[in-house]
A protein has these predicted regions:
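Active-site machinery of serine-nucleophile hydrolases
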Residues: 60-124
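Alpha-helical scaffolding within the catalytic cores
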Residues: 72-82, 175-184, 205, 209
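C-terminal catalytic histidine-bearing segment of alpha/beta-hydrolase fold enzymes
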Residues: 174, 190-252
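A domain-start/cap signature at the N-terminus of enzymes
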Residues: 17-53, 89, 123-129, 148, ...
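Bacterial Sec-dependent N-terminal signal peptides
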Residues: 1-22
């Protein structure tokens, strides 16, 4: 499996060399004195048509206010020449401020489940407000809004789905966890879950608990667990061409 993961990463290396951060414009959203910095990729295509919207949530190590760090992992795979030609999309990569999180949850002691808190985190509130602003101001296909994230962003992906179950057309949570008691409301959303079996930072039990709960609720999520892989399962996830093809086929 390590060889397969290495192959997937190497296969994307040439394309990533062409995907420059400058393709993402620098933006910020301000609401009631709070600021959410984000980068935006707009496809080099017909600006008169509508495009899918991809929301990419980074991990805890990329928090800050430089509006750069959130491009470090994963999201650049959406900006390769090959992907932009095959799957033109508007991609939003927000940056969570220091000492804050995308999700607002309380983990259970058994490290298998999360409990969704009543109110969203401030970054999540700002993100959802930004999405609603963009879908009225930009050529977005509201039947094809996708969300994905890694580590802290994986938790954030589940958080967004469970709070706003009618907003998203598909999701790809990578090494994250959610509130299993709320999966009935999101069982209709196509999902592909990724996890490293040896992850020391995000217990695989979280992903497995969500997989079990979703399946019991009648969902049919995709699930890829990399044996002998730790916390960097996103290297394989976002280099997986099958996942990319699958994601852009989804719609409400």
């Amino acid at each position: 499996m390590k060889r397969l993961l290495a192959f997937l990463v190497c296969a994307m290396a040439a394309g990533l060399a062409q995907a420059q951060p400058e393709r993402f414009s620098r933006e910020k959203y301000i609401d009631k004195g709070d600021t959410l910095y984000y980068r935006m990729l707009f496809p080099d295509a017909n600006r008169q048509r509508k495009y899918p919207l991809v929301i990419f949530l980074h991990g805890s190590g990329e928090r800050g206010a430089d509006n750069d760090a959130q491009l470090k992992w994963g999201v650049m795979n959406f900006a390769t020449d090959q992907n932009m030609l095959a799957h033109p999309a508007i991609v939003i990569a927000p940056q969570c401020p220091e000492h804050q999180t995308w999700s607002s949850t309380t983990p259970d002691k058994d490290r298998r489940r999360m409990t969704l808190n009543a109110d969203p985190s401030k970054p999540m509130r700002l993100l959802i407000a930004l999405i609603h602003k963009l879908d009225t101001a930009m050529p977005i296909d509201t039947n094809r809004i996708y969300i994905t994230g890694l580590s802290m962003g994986g938790y954030g992906t589940y958080d967004a789905l469970e709070r706003y179950p009618n907003l998203f057309a598909a999701a790809v949570p990578v090494c994250g966890g959610g509130d299993t008691s709320r999966v009935a409301s999101i069982a209709h959303i196509p999902m592909w879950i990724y996890q490293g079996a040896e992850d020391p930072a995000v217990s695989p039990l979280y992903a497995l608990a969500m997989l079990e709960a979703l399946t019991n609720a009648g969902a049919h999520p995709g699930f890829t667990q990399y044996p002998e892989v730790g916390h960097f399962s996103w290297l394989g996830a976002y280099s997986d061409p099958l996942m990319m093809e699958w994601l852009f086929r989804q719609h409400k």
